[in-house]
């Protein structure tokens, strides 16, 4: 995994980008200042919109022109619906800090989000578990509907409309990259052609257009990727009774992880990763059968064996003898009573990682640069982490009067984020594979590993600190 994700350096400037009809390097005849931007962000999803917001609210970008291209229409949430959306994100404290920096987090808190203060992860094939919490019961993270985040970002984009222009229902169809060396009759910027024929120029193009990124493909950047033989089923669930509901639950089943994320005292969001065939069955089940399947997945011990349970108990006793301190006790998740109508959907899962995040006048962020399995709950947080890093380097460059598209600071962003993202992708992929088998030796090793990790508080704190970024 790590070897496949290793960074492949670029040999010749945009040599690969000259393949295919969508990309060209041609001479430039000149352009109006009206269509020249300092930064163009391609893709107006959560990460792209947040990137444009962050730039628009940065003091060193007050005299810059920023453009956000979004292929879809403007999403307006005039009134918060009573029913919760089935598409939610787990927001880390680090991501909440980023959203707070430009005012979006206040909007989110004034609408609705749910903090969780503990997270319990356990194995369906043994009694092994790990409990993440904080001694002072600080928030570990927040479960927020994607529509709520998008509404908050839209509000903050409107607040900086003087700096940030948003073109909805607009999509780039081709790019012209600048020559690697300055030429008197060529443009030094990236040239973008939109679907309606309009042309734009930018000193820096930021690709935030998802895991099938057109920007990445047009630039000829290699993407290491594969599809897992899994789909994720998501749904909005009603609990059997009202609870404090501040724990995020995740259980590793042989077919894939199932997670229950708190939305309110009586509601939780389901993310169940399983085989394509089983996922299709879950979506088509009658409601009562579906609810029974969820409760069984969280409560049943059908995959346990006496040998594994005995071996796990021996290690647990040894740990308790050597370290007679408080050990996290296994808690029982809440039972599910029913599911919101029409909230069940599925989507395929996979992994992806761009060999390069940057080229001259180009940076990739979010899913355009990396795609991760949802078991870690880090997808959007990785994208927001990209924003924090890129914003830092671009803000410093703007303050010093540097060229925003220069590799001198773009490379620093790439180094920073590839180091973090590659480690997280590799760890997530390893966990997915480690928990996808019932082989006795593997189950025993992962049982002992989980128990040992749960007993070492400093190690758990390091894991939480890494995931909180």
Curated annotation (Swiss-Prot):
PANTHER family registered for this protein in UniProt: UBIQUINONE BIOSYNTHESIS MONOOXYGENASE COQ6, MITOCHONDRIAL
GO terms, molecular function: 2-methoxy-6-polyprenolphenol 4-hydroxylase activity; 4-hydroxy-3-all-trans-polyprenylbenzoate oxygenase activity; FAD binding; oxidoreductase activity; oxidoreductase activity, acting on paired donors, with incorporation or reduction of molecular oxygen, reduced flavin or flavoprotein as one donor, and incorporation of one atom of oxygen
Keyword set, alphabetical order: Cell projection, FAD, Flavoprotein, Golgi apparatus, Membrane, Mitochondrion, Mitochondrion inner membrane, Monooxygenase, Oxidoreductase, Transit peptide, Ubiquinone biosynthesis
InterPro entries: FAD-bd, FAD/NAD-bd_sf, Ubi_Hdrlase_CS, UbiH/COQ6, UbiH/COQ6_monooxygenase, UbQ_mOase_COQ6
GO terms for cellular component: cell projection; extrinsic component of mitochondrial inner membrane; Golgi apparatus; mitochondrion
Pathway: Cofactor biosynthesis; ubiquinone biosynthesis
Family note: Belongs to the UbiH/COQ6 family.
Cofactor: FAD
Gene3D superfamilies the record matches: FAD/NAD(P)-binding domain (3.50.50.60)
Coiled-coil parts of chain: none
Transit peptide feature, positions: 1-28
Known function: FAD-dependent monooxygenase required for two non-consecutive steps during ubiquinone biosynthesis. Required for the C5-ring hydroxylation during ubiquinone biosynthesis by catalyzing the hydroxylation of 4-hydroxy-3-(all-trans-decaprenyl)benzoic acid to 3,4-dihydroxy-5-(all-trans-decaprenyl)benzoic acid. Also acts downstream of COQ4, for the C1-hydroxylation during ubiquinone biosynthesis by catalyzing the hydroxylation of 2-methoxy-6-(all-trans-decaprenyl)phenol to 2-methoxy-6-(all-trans-decaprenyl)benzene-1,4-diol.
Compartment annotation: Mitochondrion inner membrane; Golgi apparatus; Cell projection
Quaternary structure annotation from Swiss-Prot or TrEMBL: Component of a multi-subunit COQ enzyme complex, composed of at least COQ3, COQ4, COQ5, COQ6, COQ7 and COQ9. Interacts with COQ8B and COQ7.
Its EC number(s): 1.14.15.45, 1.14.15.46
Name listed for the protein in its UniProt record: Ubiquinone biosynthesis monooxygenase COQ6, mitochondrial
One GO process term, biological-process aspect: ubiquinone biosynthetic process
Organism: Bos taurus (Bovine)
Signal peptide annotation: none
Membrane topology annotation: Peripheral membrane protein
Top-level taxon in the UniProt lineage: Eukaryota
Catalytic activity: 4-hydroxy-3-(all-trans-decaprenyl)benzoate + 2 reduced [2Fe-2S]-[ferredoxin] + O2 + 2 H(+) = 3,4-dihydroxy-5-(all-trans-decaprenyl)benzoate + 2 oxidized [2Fe-2S]-[ferredoxin] + H2O; 2-methoxy-6-(all-trans-decaprenyl)phenol + 2 reduced [2Fe-2S]-[ferredoxin] + O2 + 2 H(+) = 2-methoxy-6-(all-trans-decaprenyl)benzene-1,4-diol + 2 oxidized [2Fe-2S]-[ferredoxin] + H2O
């Amino acid at each position: 995994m790590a070897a496949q994700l290793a960074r492949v350096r670029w040999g010749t400037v945009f040599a690969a980008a000259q393949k295919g009809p969508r990309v060209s390097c041609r001479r430039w005849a000149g352009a109006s200042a009206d269509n020249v931007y300092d930064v163009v962000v391609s893709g107006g999803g959560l990460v792209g919109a947040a990137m444009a917001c962050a730039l628009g609210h940065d003091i060193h970008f007050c005299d810059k022109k920023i453009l956000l291209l979004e292929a879809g229409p403007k999403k307006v949430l005039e009134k918060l619906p009573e029913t919760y959306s089935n598409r939610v994100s787990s927001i880390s404290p680090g991501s909440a800090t980023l959203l707070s920096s430009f005012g979006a987090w206040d909007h989110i808190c004034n609408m609705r989000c749910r903090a969780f203060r503990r997270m319990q992860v356990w194995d369906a094939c043994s009694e092994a578990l790990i409990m993440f919490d904080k001694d002072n019961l600080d928030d570990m993270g927040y479960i927020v509907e994607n529509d709520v985040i998008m509404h908050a970002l839209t509000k903050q984009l409107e607040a900086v409309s003087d700096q940030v222009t948003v073109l909805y229902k607009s999509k780039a169809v081709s790019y012209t990259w600048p020559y690697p060396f300055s030429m008197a009759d060529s443009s030094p910027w990236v040239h973008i052609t939109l679907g309606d024929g309009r042309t734009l120029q930018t000193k820096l193009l930021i690709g935030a257009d998802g895991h099938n990124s057109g920007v990445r493909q047009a630039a000829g950047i290699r993407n290491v990727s594969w599809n897992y033989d899994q789909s994720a089923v998501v749904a909005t669930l009603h609990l059997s009774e009202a609870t404090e509901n501040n724990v995020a639950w995740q259980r590793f089943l042989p077919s894939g992880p199932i997670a229950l994320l708190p939305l309110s005292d009586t509601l939780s969001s389901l993310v169940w990763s399983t085989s394509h065939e089983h996922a299709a069955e879950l979506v088509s089940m009658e409601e009562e059968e579906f609810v029974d399947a969820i409760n069984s997945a969280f409560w049943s011990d059908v995959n346990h064996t006496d040998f594994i349970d005995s071996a796990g108990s021996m290690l647990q006793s040894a740990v308790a003898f050597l370290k007679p301190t408080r050990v996290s006790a296994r808690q029982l998740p809440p039972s599910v009573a029913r599911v919101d109508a029409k909230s069940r959907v599925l989507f395929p899962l996979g992994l992806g990682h761009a060999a390069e995040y940057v080229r001259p006048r180009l940076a990739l962020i979010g899913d355009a640069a990396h795609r991760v399995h949802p078991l870690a709950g880090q997808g959007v947080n990785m994208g927001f982490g990209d924003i924090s890093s890129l914003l830092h380097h671009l803000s410093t460059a703007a303050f010093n009067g540097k060229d925003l598209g220069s590799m001198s600071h773009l490379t620093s962003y790439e180094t920073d984020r590839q180091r973090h993202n590659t480690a997280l992708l590799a760890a997530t992929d390893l966990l997915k594979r480690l928990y996808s088998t019932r082989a006795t030796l593997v189950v025993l090793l992962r049982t002992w590993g989980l128990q040992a990790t749960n007993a070492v508080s400093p190690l758990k704190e390091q894991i939480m600190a890494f995931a909180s970024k």
